[in-house]
């Protein structure tokens, strides 16, 4: 479990060394830093080993750990079985006077855990202190309890209470029989789920060290953390969003500044080129080496000429991710010429092999710029299309998010989609709980029911971070109508199914447009004669939904509300089509 974390720690220390700052010796860092414990107690534990689940955060906010012993106990308690002891432990920590021991002999054993049995070692100590077991025999009891050997434990109960050869027994040691019987019951209930303390302590060391690095070196730590999850788009998105929430900028991918992997850059995190889809890490390593040896790329065509191993899919993905934005051209322009540019560079490289020719040798020494392959005077992609292409090429929205306009509404909801995805039934969210979340409908599919009596809806509901499977029964699917389409922003209410063997799913029983109740779409026209209005309404009718539309006549300074049958669903597809038809500057949601 700790291997990934050890890699993150190693890479974090490497980034710190690169920055020229002193590298902390974690073996010498004391486990007593109040600021680190305050961060943990606040639930700010993204990326902290063993402490980042929603339920654990909630527990930590109640516990408010302030010492290493609390971390060891917290990791041990937050498991099925021992979890029942959490309220008692928290109460004991914050009110030591409430701690009650079944017998005085238990106090020195359980005082550090406020009267609660938390570790297997405590069970071993109890049978030794109360009944006179040897070290070896106490370990046999621990093993029998953990493996639920009931026949063995029935005998051990009698030995614990009344003794046997080599065992004094609790009664002979001054413990009342009823008390001894009760203590043995508590050990039985607890021991089958218990951690051993040494195991929990090893986990707590990693938990503290990752928390320490997160607090004092957040840029380096989050960069290393993101790199450790490059194969998981949802997890990368989660930590990118976490960085932004901590005021850390995540800079876009750029062929002149990015490395193959994510890297710290001037107090920010630079997106790694290898995280762009269809772009091989090996090719990007070659690119970085070329840039390091021969300087930054002067322009798009210089990049095509100097980097070996490129293909058209790679170039398209790099353009869509914004990797050439700093060179001054528009993404739409690069998308229009990249195939010709790559063909030209391949031809020149072949010629170079025979005659030492380069792109700079063409046309009497002129560089291959717009004179040879001109960048078209094309308008930039609409913001919606740009976001879609960013998502297609990186798995993330880089220059914004389709849900940004709904941020205030989403903040008012009790849960987020990533919290539903991570729920394990032990935290705030329980299995089959009714929840309401906001997100984007994606991967929408319809399939017949087994009886053939209707259609089921299957989709993935995506939040700003995280995603959860969504299921709609025929009645709900029929009611959803136009909302069951890709990229539709929705407010979904339903029952969460928490499953151990596969991803959680949300059984949706009600779905509404997200934020549409308070917004209207305004479309501005220089003038609005009847024929223009008729064509506009015909366009709107192709995107039926709940958002009211106002057609504004600039010449008369009058707004006309479109009839309800021309209300629209605000999706990425609709906004892209509307911007193309009416002009980006002529449509507005408010």
Where are these regions (language model features)?
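Noncatalytic, beta-rich nucleic-acid-contacting surfaces in large DNA/RNA-processing enzymes
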Residues: 1-590
């Amino acid at each position: 479990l700790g291997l990934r974390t050890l890699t993150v720690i190693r890479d974090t220390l490497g980034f710190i060394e690169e920055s020229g700052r002193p590298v902390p010796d974690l073996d010498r860092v004391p486990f007593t830093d109040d600021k680190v414990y305050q961060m943990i107690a606040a639930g700010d534990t993204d990326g902290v080993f063993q402490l980042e689940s929603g339920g654990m955060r909630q527990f930590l906010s109640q516990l408010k750990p302030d010492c290493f012993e609390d971390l060891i106990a917290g990791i041990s308690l937050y498991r099925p079985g021992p979890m029942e002891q959490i309220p008692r432990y928290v109460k004991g920590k914050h009110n030591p006077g409430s701690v009650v021991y079944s017998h005085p002999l238990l106090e020195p054993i359980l005082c550090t855990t406020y009267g609660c049995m938390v570790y297997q070692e405590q069970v071993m100590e109890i049978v030794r202190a109360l009944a006179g077991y040897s070290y070896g025999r106490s370990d046999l009891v621990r093993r029998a309890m953990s493996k639920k050997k009931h026949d063995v434990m029935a005998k051990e109960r009698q030995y614990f209470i009344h003794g046997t050869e080599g065992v004094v027994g609790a009664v002979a040691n001054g413990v009342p029989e009823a008390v001894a019987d009760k203590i043995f019951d508590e050990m039985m209930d607890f021991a089958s789920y218990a951690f051993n303390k040494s195991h929990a302590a090893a986990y707590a060391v990693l938990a503290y060290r990752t928390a320490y690095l997160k607090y004092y070196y957040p840029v380096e730590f989050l960069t290393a953390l993101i790199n450790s999850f490059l194969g998981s788009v949802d997890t990368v998105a989660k930590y990118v969003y976490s960085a932004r929430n901590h005021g850390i900028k995540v800079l876009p991918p750029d062929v002149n500044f990015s490395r193959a992997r994510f890297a710290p850059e001037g107090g920010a995190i630079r997106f790694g080129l290898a995280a762009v889809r269809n772009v091989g890490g090996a090719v990007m390593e070659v690119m970085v080496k070329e840039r390091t040896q021969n300087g930054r790329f002067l322009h798009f065509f210089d990049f095509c000429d100097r980097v070996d191993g490129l293909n058209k899919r790679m170039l398209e993905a790099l353009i869509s991710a914004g990797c050439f934005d700093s060179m001054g051209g528009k993404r739409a322009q690069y998308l229009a010429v990249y195939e010709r540019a790559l063909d030209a560079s391949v031809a020149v490289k072949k010629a170079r092999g025979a005659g030492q020719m380069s792109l700079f040798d063409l046309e009497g020494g002129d560089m291959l710029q717009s004179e040879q392959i001109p960048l078209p005077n094309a308008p930039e992609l609409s913001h919606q299309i740009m976001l879609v292409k960013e998502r297609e090429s990186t798995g993330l929205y880089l220059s914004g998010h389709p849900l940004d306009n709904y941020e205030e509404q989403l903040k008012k909801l009790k849960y987020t989609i990533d919290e539903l995805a991570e729920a394990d039934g032990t935290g705030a969210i329980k299995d089959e709980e009714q929840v309401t979340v906001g997100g984007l409908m994606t991967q929408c599919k319809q399939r017949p029911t087994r009886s053939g009596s209707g259609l089921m809806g299957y989709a993935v509901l995506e939040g700003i971070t995280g995603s959860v499977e969504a299921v709609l029964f025929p009645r709900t699917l029929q009611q959803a109508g136009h909302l069951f389409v890709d990229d539709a922003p929705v407010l979904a209410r339903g029952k969460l199914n928490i499953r151990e063997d596969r991803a959680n799913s949300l059984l949706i029983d009600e779905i509404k447009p997200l934020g549409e109740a308070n917004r209207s779409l305004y479309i501005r026209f220089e003038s609005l004669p009847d024929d223009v209005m008729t064509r506009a309404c015909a366009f709107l009718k192709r995107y039926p939904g709940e958002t009211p539309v106002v057609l504004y006549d600039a010449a008369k300074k009058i707004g006309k509300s479109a009839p309800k049958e021309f209300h629209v669903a605000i999706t990425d597809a609709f906004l892209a089509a509307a911007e193309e038809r009416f002009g980006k500057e002529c449509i507005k949601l408010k």
